[in-house]
Amino acid sequence: ILSLMQKLEIQGGKKLVGTINISGSKNATLPILAATILTDKKVIIHNVPSVRDVTTMIELLNEMGSVVKFSAKEKKIEIKNNKSLKTLAPYNLLKTMRAGVLVLGALLAKYKSAKVSLPGGCAIGSRPINLHLIALKKMGAKIKLKNGYVIASAKDGLKGCFYKFPKVSVGATENILIASCF
């Protein structure tokens, strides 16, 4: 391991030239999929990886009423939402992935209510979603936990606010940004 004061010098006989294809990222795709809830326009996403969490999020969106077509061969997703989606994200779909909680902010912003199962599927260990909930409350959401579900409402809509997370949370930041877009 190099310290900050050391350097690594590579001497080679040829300049590097060429192109490489970068594969799509699950961690970029999942919040984009959740954010599609906010629009009734057709959305096309390219360079989508064919991994379990992505296919589970597609199942969730379909269950909620979105029309989602995924071509693993083309690495492309097309999404068109009906005028009104279901605001329930059930346990049977969220039990295997943490990112399902990202639909909470989108549903609250657009429909002013959501019932979202507490997430599962984390190989890293327990990572609570309290930071998501605290920030959404700061934006005006009423939230309660009941029978393994987050039941949230924002009768008057969510309101913009200044909020600084007490610690870094990529997922909570994504959720609040999505919630702030509608």
Positions of PLM-derived features:
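Structural preference for solvent-exposed beta-strand-turn elements
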Residues: 1-182
